[in-house]
Amino acid sequence: MIDHTHLRLFQFCDSQFPTGAFSHSFGLETYIQRNIIHDDHTFIAWLKMFLQEQLTYSDGLAMRLVYDALENDDTQKVLHIDKLMFVQNLPKETRVGAKQMGTRMVKLALELYNNPWIAWYHQQMQDKKAKLNPAICFTMLGHYLGVDIETIIDYYLYQNVSSLTQNAVRAIPLGQTAGQKIVTHMIPYIEETRKQIFELKEADFGMTAPGLELNQMAHENVNVRIFIS
């Protein structure tokens, strides 16, 4: 039997879901223009790094901490993590891009569900107490739907892998079949990453690869672009 609560959350993983993810490469485009990424093998190496660094120590760990805060009705903890997610994201384009995606996801979630936590989160943004982040919104939605945190993180990581792969298909370019092979190849790494997230301490939050941040910053100065970040 289909678990409709999981399907409702998985709807937000659809590549056609209008959060703006298709407009962001999060530094990938810089690597492509420098010819560091030029085929499926070099893209997979980059995608593993992005998954095991930025999505582990920032988004994934934040989701685990936010879920615990929701369980304890700790609003101050949620606001603290929202602030950390914004200020530790040093490259301007990725910082602003995450805020834009978070805002779109929150507004769409409010259109679809009467979720008190997301309504509260949106109000905090209007009161200038929160920036809005897609990882936090996704966690709130999963929590509201009664989905366990392990599955919430798996879905979120999958959504990012799928979205970035579709962007790579356009930018490198790759064939659609090659893109689907990459997503299939990455599924075991998604599970490994989720397990790693549950082994981290809160003090590990925000660690990332300097080379990734530098290439995200350098994207501001690329001559020709198809992505915002």
Swiss-Prot record:
Which family would the database say this protein is a member of?
Answer: Belongs to the UreF family.
- Which InterPro entries does the UniProt record give? UreF, UreF_sf
Q: What is its main location?
A: cytoplasm
Task: List the Gene3D superfamilies.
Answer: Urease accessory protein UreF (1.10.4190.10)
- Give the location in the cell: Cytoplasm
Q: Which UniProt keywords apply?
A: Chaperone, Cytoplasm, Nickel insertion
Q: What does this protein do?
A: Required for maturation of urease via the functional incorporation of the urease nickel metallocenter.
Molecular function, one GO term: nickel cation binding
Organism per entry: Staphylococcus aureus (strain MRSA252)
User: What's the protein here called?
Assistant: Urease accessory protein UreF
Q: How does it assemble?
A: UreD, UreF and UreG form a complex that acts as a GTP-hydrolysis-dependent molecular chaperone, activating the urease apoprotein by helping to assemble the nickel containing metallocenter of UreC. The UreE protein probably delivers the nickel.
Q: Record's GO cellular component, any one? A: cytoplasm
What's a Pfam family this protein contains?
UreF
Q: Does the keyword Cytoplasm apply?
A: yes
